[in-house]
Regions:
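NUDIX/MutT-family hydrolases
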Residues: 81, 91-123
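N-terminal strand-loop-strand
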Residues: 1-27, 56, 60
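Conserved Nudix-box catalytic region and its N-terminal flanking loop in Nudix hydrolases
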Residues: 13-50
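Charged phosphate-binding loop/patch that engages nucleotide di/tri-phosphates or the phosphate backbone
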Residues: 117-149
Length: 149
C-alpha cells in the first residue's frame, strides 16, 4: 500500500509555535505534500515560503508517523525543527483559514493531531540547549536552503 508523504516544520517564535488552521478546523504545522523526485528539505523550504512567506533553515528531523487524515485515508507525516532564515513577517496564504502562535502549554487544548504536539515538544526540548543555542546535526546535501545541521 502506498501513502502520500507530508513534510512539516516546527517553527518556534519567542517560545510560541506557529500553527495553521486547515479546512477540517484542525491546527497543523506548516508544510505540505512531497512532490515526486523532490528532496524532503527542499519541500519544506518551499512550503514555508508558500504558506507563510518566510524562509527557514532546517535544523533537525524530529518524528515520522502514519496519520489517518479521514476515515481510511492515511498520510505519512515527517516533521523537522526549523529556524527563520530572514526577518520577513509571517503572512497567511489562501491554503489555510487562520495563522496562530501558541505557547507550549496551550497545545493540549487545541484540535490537532497528537503527533504534531509530540513534534513541537521534541523541538522545544532540542532547540534550547544549556548554552541557549539550537542543537546541531551534521550537514547533508539536497535542499536549496542553507542548513547548518
Amino acid at each position: 500500500m502506498l501513502f502520500p508523504v507530508s513534510i512539516k516544520g516546527v517553527l518556534l517564535e519567542a517560545g510560541r509555535v506557529v500553527l495553521l488552521e486547515n479546512e477540517r478546523e484542525e491546527w497543523e504545522l506548516p508544510g505540505g505534500r512531497l512532490e515526486t523526485g523532490e528532496d524532503p528539505m527542499a519541500c519544506l523550504v518551499r512550503e514555508f515560503a508558500e504558506e507563510l512567506g518566510v524562509s527557514v533553515i532546517i535544523k533537525a528531523i524530529l518524528d515520522c508517523w502514519l496519520y489517518e487524515v479521514l476515515p481510511a485515508r492515511y498520510v505519512v507525516i515527517v516533521t523537522y525543527g526549523v529556524e527563520r532564515a530572514g526577518v520577513e513577517a509571517l503572512r497567511l496564504s489562501a491554503e489555510h483559514r487562520r495563522l496562530g502562535t501558541f505557547a507550549l502549554d496551550e497545545l493540549d487544548g487545541l484540535p490537532m493531531p497528537e503527533g504534531y504536539r509530540r513534534s513541537v515538544r521534541a523541538w522545544a526540548a532540542i532547540a534550547f540547549t544549556a548554552k541557549g543555542s539550537p542543537a546541531r546535526l551534521p550537514e547533508r546535501g539536497g535542499a536549496s536552503a542553507s542548513r547548518d545541521f
